[in-house]
């Protein structure tokens, strides 16, 4: 698997619609400084591979097109009922829906990554430690209600990963 560098400082991993996997320059710099291990980067790559293998990027593009159509129709309707605010309300509803769909995709990609990490012999610990580090780096704890976030809260993701591990190992 070829890992590409996306030249931006924020710490992130990305999957492109064509299947390429990226980590940001900021992420790579954390690795170079010894703040992140190669096993933790492997967990991010496995997660992004999950997005590709499960068709999340393509699905998100389709969802986005549909969401724009619904947002426009809902905005037009609500603008007639609530002049001046209808478009704004429709936009909020659309964003909430997209955040929910994105969180579902994140859980699925986490599960895919966990299975890959376990199968490779690395186990789930690098995945869990990476989430904890990302949580500290991004300082997102408690900044937004979970229903507004595009990614599930770290504690929920870690608990989900532990459940997957228990399911695979029967414990």
Question: Can you annotate each of these PLM segments?
Answer:
Residues 1-171:
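A Zn2+-metalloprotease active-site environment signal
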């Amino acid at each position: 698997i070829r890992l590409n560098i996306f030249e931006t400082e924020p710490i992130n991993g990305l999957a492109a619609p064509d299947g390429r996997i990226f980590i940001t320059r900021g992420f790579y710099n954390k690795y170079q400084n010894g703040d992140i291990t190669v096993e933790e980067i492997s967990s991010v790559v496995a997660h992004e591979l999950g997005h590709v293998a499960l068709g999340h990027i393509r699905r998100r593009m389709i969802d986005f097109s549909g969401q724009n159509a619904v947002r426009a129709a809902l905005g037009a309707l609500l603008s007639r009922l609530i002049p001046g605010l209808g478009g704004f309300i429709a936009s909020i509803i659309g964003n909430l829906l997209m955040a929910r769909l994105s969180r579902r995709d994140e859980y699925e990609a986490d599960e895919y990554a966990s299975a890959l990490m376990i199968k490779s012999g690395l186990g789930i610990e690098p995945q869990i430690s990476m989430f904890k580090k990302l949580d500290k780096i991004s300082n997102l704890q408690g900044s937004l209600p979970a229903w507004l976030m595009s990614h599930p809260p770290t504690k929920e993701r870690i608990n989900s990963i532990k459940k997957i591990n228990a399911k695979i190992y029967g414990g």
